[in-house]
């Protein structure tokens, strides 16, 4: 027998399988300021106690495996293991629990969202002892936050670059999203920007297809930007989607955008991946480009209430990885978004310090220690009648993005942009005069139609359009 084996045997290594809760369920644990804290919604399999399920999550997302291994004796489990330090039943739900887990900071690579997610939501979501598992929230300690660059520029720097203050920014996604030639696409961009929008946008699946290669699109859109800037005297932008099949190709497109002198590029951060996104964010900061983030694929991850990852976690991860804008739902349009939940993660995107508030789904107090903020983007099924509600819900630090609500105007793209700009300016002026947008919104829009035939035509077209469906993701009662 070797000396190493003798030593291990002498301290009583005992092979076999132990209940996770014997090692990883520690209700007496006092969390540290440096711990990453997680709130999981756990649905155990029948017969599995909630404490065992919570401990299993802590174990499988940190140092544990299914059996005792002799190499446990070569390190300090007490220093490195995750700990389930609290379990509470979910009100109104049968056999669902919130399990609180604390992870020591040394488990994570600095400045890597990829590594953080690989650890916390890696294998554990396929664990057989759990019927379902959802990561509801994370508390990122300030010590870890400071290892991230975060958004390339942030809200204030973006306003300074654009010279636009005191109102939400206006955008438009060019439609049809697929099929236009580069020249016709650029024409649509020009008409929208000339009409009064601040931004236009590539749709998330516009990359470099046979009908419109990326270089051609970039060139025609740059021409549209500069022509509309010269005519209006305002700084304009188009979110040029740099997302590509490889990181190298993505960077090539971002470099070309910078050489053209445009102000902003775009990335699909979930399909593109956090590693690619962080690399692009670093390039954008170093080269003066704003970065718009689309959340394509998010609903695959966050739509189900009992399994997946809540979008507030994906939003926090984006702020760490880097992005100046991110789509965040509308509350009033065609896409998912319950009001209090949406406002909760909008605050997590914009503010420096956010208090724990379970009424808005915020499980932990989060201190971003001056990490730049991200502008939430409201888009999806919105039109001029929604403008008062959007202005009231999202406030000035937001981007309101009307695709069909601009391009669907009966008179064309430029009049559609005029209608949206007039509606926004009317709402901002009314709010600044002390009027209540929530109760007087429709009246404010009707008054503005007297001075804008474009707005009057838009109001007539969309007066009956509503998307009245119950949100899937609601607060626990």
Curated annotation (Swiss-Prot):
Gene Ontology terms: cellular component: chloroplast
Residue positions, PTM N6-carboxylysine: 201
Main location: plastid
PTM comment, free text: The disulfide bond which can form in the large chain dimeric partners within the hexadecamer appears to be associated with oxidative stress and protein turnover.
Pfam families linked to this entry: RuBisCO_large, RuBisCO_large_N
UniProt site (Transition state stabilizer): 334
Binding residues annotated for substrate, in chain numbering: 123, 173, 177, 295, 327, 379
UniProt EC number: 4.1.1.39
Catalyses which reaction(s): 2 (2R)-3-phosphoglycerate + 2 H(+) = D-ribulose 1,5-bisphosphate + CO2 + H2O; D-ribulose 1,5-bisphosphate + O2 = 2-phosphoglycolate + (2R)-3-phosphoglycerate + 2 H(+)
InterPro entries: RuBisCO, RuBisCo_large_chain_AS, RuBisCO_lsu_C, RuBisCO_lsu_C_sf, RuBisCO_lsu_fd_N, RuBisCO_lsu_N_sf, RuBisCO_lsuI
Molecular function in Gene Ontology: magnesium ion binding; monooxygenase activity; ribulose-bisphosphate carboxylase activity
Function: RuBisCO catalyzes two reactions: the carboxylation of D-ribulose 1,5-bisphosphate, the primary event in carbon dioxide fixation, as well as the oxidative fragmentation of the pentose substrate in the photorespiration process. Both reactions occur simultaneously and in competition at the same active site.
Name recorded for this polypeptide: Ribulose bisphosphate carboxylase large chain
Species per Swiss-Prot/TrEMBL record: Lactuca sativa
Gene: rbcL
């Amino acid at each position: 027998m070797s000396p190493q084996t003798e030593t291990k045997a002498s301290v009583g290594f005992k092979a076999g399988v132990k209940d996770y809760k014997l090692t990883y369920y520690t209700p007496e644990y006092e969390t540290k300021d440096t711990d990453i804290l997680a709130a999981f919604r756990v649905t155990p399999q029948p017969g599995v106690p909630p404490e065992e399920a919570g401990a299993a999550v802590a174990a499988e997302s940190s140092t544990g495996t299914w059996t005792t291994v002799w190499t446990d004796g070569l390190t300090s489990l007490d220093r490195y293991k995750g700990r389930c330090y609290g379990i509470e039943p979910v009100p109104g739900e049968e056999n669902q629990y919130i399990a609180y887990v604390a992870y020591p900071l040394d488990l994570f690579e600095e400045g890597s969202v990829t590594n953080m997610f690989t650890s916390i939501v890696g294998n554990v979501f396929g664990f057989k002892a759990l019927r379902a598992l959802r990561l509801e929230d994370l508390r990122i300690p300030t010590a870890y936050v400071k290892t991230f660059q975060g958004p390339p520029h942030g809200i204030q720097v973006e306003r300074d670059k654009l010279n636009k203050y005191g109102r939400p920014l206006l955008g438009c996604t060019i439609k049809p999203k697929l099929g236009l030639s580069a020249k016709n696409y650029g024409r649509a961009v020009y008409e929208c920007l000339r009409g009064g929008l601040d931004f236009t946008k590539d749709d998330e699946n516009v990359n470099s297809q046979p009908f419109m290669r990326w270089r051609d699109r970039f060139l025609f859109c740059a021409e549209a930007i500069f022509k509309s800037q010269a005519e209006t005297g305002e700084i304009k932008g188009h979110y040029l989607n740099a997302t590509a099949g490889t990181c190298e190709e993505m960077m090539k497109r971002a470099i070309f955008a910078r050489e053209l002198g445009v102000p902003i590029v775009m990335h699909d951060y979930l399909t593109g991946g956090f590693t690619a996104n962080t690399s692009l964010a670093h390039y954008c900061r170093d080269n003066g480009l704003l970065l718009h983030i689309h959340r394509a694929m998010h609903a695959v991850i966050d739509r189900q209430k009992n399994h997946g990852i809540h979008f507030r976690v994906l939003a926090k991860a984006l702020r760490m990885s880097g992005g100046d804008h991110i789509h965040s739902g509308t509350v009033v349009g065609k896409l998912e978004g319950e009001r209090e939940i949406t406002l909760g993660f909008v605050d997590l995107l914009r503010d420096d310090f956010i208090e724990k508030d379970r009424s808005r789904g915020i499980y932990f107090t989060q201190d971003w220690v001056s990490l730049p903020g991200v502008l939430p983007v409201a888009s999806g099924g919105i039109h001029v009648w929604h403008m008062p509600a959007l202005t009231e819900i999202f406030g000035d630090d937001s981007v309101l993005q009307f695709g069909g609500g601009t391009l669907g105007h009966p008179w064309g793209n430029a009049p559609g942009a005029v209608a949206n700009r007039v509606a926004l300016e009317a709402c901002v002026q009314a709010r600044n005069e002390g009027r209540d947008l929530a109760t007087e919104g429709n009246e404010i829009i009707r008054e503005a139609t007297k001075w804008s035939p474009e707005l009057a035509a838009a109001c007539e077209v969309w007066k009956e359009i509503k998307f009245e469906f119950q949100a899937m993701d609601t607060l626990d009662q």
